[in-house]
Amino acid sequence: MTRSLKKNPFVANHLLEKVEKLNMREEKKIIVTWSRSSTIIPTMIGHTIAIHNGREHLPIYITDRMVGHKLGEFAPTLTFRGHARNDNRSRR
């Protein structure tokens, strides 16, 4: 179910403050965050945000096509290592 249109998109306060501060200074630094549930808003375009995936922070450059999506969508938490091998030879 999607978020109600009456509500504003969720962005963590600390993340929003960091983005606004960098926009005021016109700096481009990497912003480190654990807030995967924050929505990408237009003021974040052009910044690099390091999103935590449970093990490390992955730097993601924010473009205009990402607006409206959540930060966690761009930092996968699982690594697929392949299906289990079918070991019929060793069972004989």
UniProtKB/Swiss-Prot annotation:
It comes from the Eukaryota. GO terms for molecular function: rRNA binding; structural constituent of ribosome. GO terms for cellular component: chloroplast; mitochondrial small ribosomal subunit. It is found in: Plastid, Chloroplast. Keywords: Chloroplast, Plastid, Ribonucleoprotein, Ribosomal protein, RNA-binding, rRNA-binding. The keyword 4Fe-4S does not apply. One of its GO terms (biological process) is ribosomal small subunit assembly. The keyword Ribonucleoprotein applies. Its main location: plastid. Belongs to the universal ribosomal protein uS19 family. PANTHER family: RIBOSOMAL PROTEIN S19P FAMILY MEMBER, SMALL RIBOSOMAL SUBUNIT PROTEIN US19M. Protein S19 forms a complex with S13 that binds strongly to the 16S ribosomal RNA. This is Small ribosomal subunit protein uS19c.
